Amino acid sequence: MRRPLRRVTVVLLWVALAIGVAWFYDYRRSMQSLWKIRQHGKIVVLTENNANSYYIYKETPMGFEYDLAKAFAGHLGVDLEVKTPGWDALFASLQRGDGDFIAASMTHTRKREQYADFSEPYLSVRQHLILHKSDHSIVTPAGLAGRTVHVREDTTYQQRLEALQADGIDLQLVLHRNTPTEELIEQVAKRQIDITVADSAIALLNRRYYPDIRIAFPIEKEQPLAWAVRKGDRGLRTEINRFFDEIKENGTFTRIYNRYYTAVDTFDYVDVKKFHQRIYTRLPRFRPLIEKAADRHGFDWQMIAAVIYQESHFDPFAQSHTGVKGLMQLTRVTAEEMGVTDRFDFEQNITAGVAYLAKLRHRFDDIEDPRTRLLFALASYNIGYGHVRDAQQIAKNMGMDPNRWQSLKEVLPLLRNREYYADTTYGYARGNEAVRYIERILTYYDILKQKKAV
């Protein structure tokens, strides 16, 4: 009796050992890519080359997905390499090992799970119809009957529109193999096609470039965006999830998101439409002086142009009831300080205004990040250096980092409330206007960056 029992025990031990060995090798294989990434000191991201994910401007890489991927590489302590094989080749490139993960504002769907494993969602979006601003003929999905909709092939847009067709809506669907959604949006703006579909993030970002479009109602419930890794790559997937948890907790995700999308939320069609026109009708007259002054003080000339448009709409004779005058809306005190004899002389105005902005930026040399230092200087240009320092103190009192733009953005509006400004040095200020001021400048700046003819 004991011998059969012993035999069963031995068999069970061998089975357990086999399972353990199989688990060990499976676990080792699932962790191998992360180990190799750290060994080689580099991670390769597969993404899209567009305004939403990744693009190069003056030799500087930018884009929402790029910034997230760059932060992830920093989280791992490795360098980042970017590859853009094209939307249709993303999964194939991942499976071949051309890249380690996909970061391309990709929605996580069941169909795509057969090609890759996905991280936890980091953002949710909704699909919207995109029409010309003059087209108000469609108010419900049923209004698509008899209309033609253009979308990129093999996207969730195609899947949703086919579902509407299956529900009985007689729409005509035109699929584009190699045409990015951004180009279809441009075609709507130029009246080359009537309708396309884009998710909310892509739609918002592109509306600033194509103010003639209208973002209509959503045609789908919220969908999750996630990063993709090779099937079975649990190690990298787990690390990505840990990374997103970390950056959402410490505010990094919010800062990156706000850089690309917050200013879009304050979109004003009439104002942006005028800006697009005045880039060609007014800006050329002042551009040489703007470039000269910007170069002297180490600014991007397009940022200075954006500031000037926010201040005066490129009108050299602009003046306010507060007494500020000229292209950069100089106060009398600032003009005297900077040696300006005529604030309506646009050469004097630009030269002095840019020099003064550089002076303000220098006063924030304790802030290491150049972009943050610029934003603090712009806030000071708008409401005054003293108020910005007051806001920093409030942020510090609230346990926030006073040298972060996200902190300043949250506390500046508090300068309107007595319970906060009563104990400050400079008192009351309309800090919310300073926040909106900077958001508009960033919108104008981004438009100028994307303008190929400027």
UniProtKB/Swiss-Prot annotation:
Keyword entries, A-Z: Cell outer membrane, Cell wall biogenesis/degradation, Lyase, Membrane, Signal
- Where is it localised? Cell outer membrane
Q: Where is this region: Non-LT domain?
A: 25-265
Tell me which GO cellular component terms the UniProt record holds. cell outer membrane
Q: How does it sit in the membrane?
A: Peripheral membrane protein
GO biological process terms on file: cell wall organization; peptidoglycan metabolic process
UniProt-annotated catalytic positions: 311
Matching entries from InterPro entries are given as: Lysozyme-like_dom_sf, MltF, Solute-binding_3/MltF_N, Transglyc_AS, Transglycosylase_SLT_dom_1
The Swiss-Prot or TrEMBL note on domains reads: The N-terminal domain does not have lytic activity and probably modulates enzymatic activity. The C-terminal domain is the catalytic active domain.
User: What PANTHER family is this protein classified in?
Assistant: MEMBRANE-BOUND LYTIC MUREIN TRANSGLYCOSYLASE F
What is the protein name for this chain? Membrane-bound lytic murein transglycosylase F
Q: Which organism is it from?
A: Desulfosudis oleivorans (strain DSM 6200 / JCM 39069 / Hxd3) (Desulfococcus oleovorans)
